[in-house]
């Protein structure tokens, strides 16, 4: 069958040498783009968040479960990244139920304590609602204002949340791709 336009060449033929040269050229272009991207990242200035406050410690102590060693290591690494004046470039991966949300919650709290707003993107409306409740429950005693933006909110509610977000009256917004819409503006993300 047709393999999507792939063509097999016999080694050593003119077609093989031509294909090999084309691939080498493309690889050089990709390598050049990657080098330029990493150079740009290296020069980029980020926002250096302050060291943990006593409230951060109190907030973290309010976690009702025992953290795993991996969770504690990830939390420490993320917070160290946040305290650097370079944009963070980190991907956190883990199976369901292994504490990724708590890592995000602590980073979000640190960001809010550092005077910034936080946008937390969830892949589904149901997950956005669950994460919103978890963020809200964890932040409730610390005066952090958390809202959710998704299709479960009426257009009127969405408009009000967006207005408050732009005014800086919302610290953390949890939502689906809706939070990426052009009408969603932040005071200081």
Per-region residue spans from a language model:
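Conserved glycine(s) of the Walker
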Residues: 99
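AAA+/P-loop NTPase substrate/partner-engagement loops
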Residues: 125-130, 137, 148-157
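Upstream accessory/linker segments immediately N-terminal to the RecA-like ATPase cores of bacterial MutS
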Residues: 1-70
